[in-house]
Design a protein with these regions (language model features):
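Conserved histidines in hydrophobic membrane contexts and catalytic metal-binding motifs
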Residues: 1-374
């Protein structure tokens, strides 16, 4: 007769075994595509080198408004600027991003040499992170198998069961650790290797599973509801110029870029110069920033820092351009601990938080996970 202890031991063992048989292939595919995604920044910079980089000149760059006008020359008159990312350094281009009413979640970015106003090229960019086509393909392969919404079942399944496999694996190791040391069979040797890798990767396995679930289709929605209920959500700028402030929606990597519903606001390019000047005067000092014009007449301009590499710079500001007045400002240092951990967790998951070291750790993790599964 099974005791309560042996019942639970058998149950967790069976869960681990059968999940390994039926779910591990999905986790293996996620690990392989995650490994490829982790090393894409270097490939992306090489593939799009002529678009992303310029020869720095010993002169002052042209005004941002002039760069925007240069970008408009190669786009249809109906195209509307929805975002501008000034060149973060003297050897990089400025991105002027236009709406794309045809393709969901993508926009068209025109890359401008800030010194010569030459158009270096234009590419489709995806999501609020502005990911370029090569990485977009790998991103979607990793997150939805290139199958759209229904493909997200796979990644949610992989992330959910990765956490379960990790915890049941730890439990099984704890209960069998003495037997593995005493009985020197070939099977036990393999189990020891499997257990050693699992224990070594344990913190990363949970981190990847949890951060992966935060932007999943169904669990992600529940996590956002729970964070809101616990008052752990990421703070949002008040961008409404009326008393009933309407918040912006702050997305992370992998999320969609919503298209504006009303872009006919007669915005002139020189307003970008003014917005940039006001933002710099109010402490928005990161090299990587994005400037977004309002999408309706009762909304403010928003300027946000988008430096995801440590130390994170994610301050943001909302400006009433009619009065040249700041109506709201958020500083990353004032975020709650949970909001900061969410930001850092997501950035670590996609390999940008600690640069090449982050990428190397993720690549080694993905490789070791593949070995564990195989």
């Amino acid at each position: 007769m099974l005791t309560q202890s042996s019942f639970w031991r058998s149950l967790y063992r069976l869960i681990h075994i059968y999940a390994g048989i039926f779910i591990a292939p999905f986790i293996l595919f996620a690990a392989i595509t995650g490994l490829l995604y982790a090393i894409t920044p270097q490939f992306e910079q090489a593939i799009y080198k002529d678009v992303l980089y310029v020869e720095p000149l010993n002169q002052t760059p042209h005004k941002l408004s002039q760069q925007i006008e240069a970008a408009k020359q190669v786009m249809p008159k109906s195209a509307q600027v929805i975002e501008v990312r000034p060149a973060p350094s003297s050897d990089q281009t400025t991105r002027v991003i236009f709406s794309d009413s045809i393709h969901d979640f993508t926009s068209e970015a025109v890359f401008i040499d800030p010194f010569t106003l030459k158009v270096q090229g234009h590419l489709a960019v995806y999501g609020t992170s502005g990911v370029l086509p090569f990485r977009t393909t790998l991103d979607q392969l990793h997150s939805n198998l290139l199958l759209g919404k229904w493909g997200r079942f796979y990644s949610e399944l992989a992330a959910s069961w990765l956490a379960i496999l990790t915890l049941t694996g730890l439990y099984n190791w704890w209960k069998r650790r003495q037997n593995l040391k005493i009985r020197q069979t070939q099977k036990n040797k393999l189990l020891r290797w499997h257990s050693t890798l699992g224990l070594t990767l344990f913190p990363l396995l949970l981190l990847i599973a949890i951060t992966g679930l935060t932007w999943s289709e169904w669990a992600g929605d529940n996590i956002r509801v729970a964070r809101q209920w616990l008052n752990w959500q990421t703070p949002t700028l008040a961008i409404s110029l009326q008393t009933d402030n309407l918040p912006t929606v702050m997305h992370h990597e992998h999320h969609e870029m919503p298209h504006s519903e009303n872009l006919n606001l007669n915005i002139v390019s020189t307003e970008y110069d003014t917005a940039l000047s006001i933002a710099r005067a109010h402490g928005i000092d990161a090299a990587q920033i994005q400037i977004k014009p309002p999408t309706s007449g009762n909304q403010a301009w928003t300027i946000a820092e988008i430096q995801r590499k440590w130390p994170t710079q994610a301050d943001s500001i909302a400006i009433d351009m009619e009065q040249h007045k700041v109506i709201d400002q958020l500083a990353f240092k004032d975020y709650s601990l949970v909001a900061k951990l969410t930001r850092w967790g997501v950035d670590a998951h996609i390999g940008v938080l600690f640069g090449w070291i982050n990428q190397l750790v993720l690549a080694l993790y993905a490789f070791a996970l593949c070995i564990m599964i195989i």
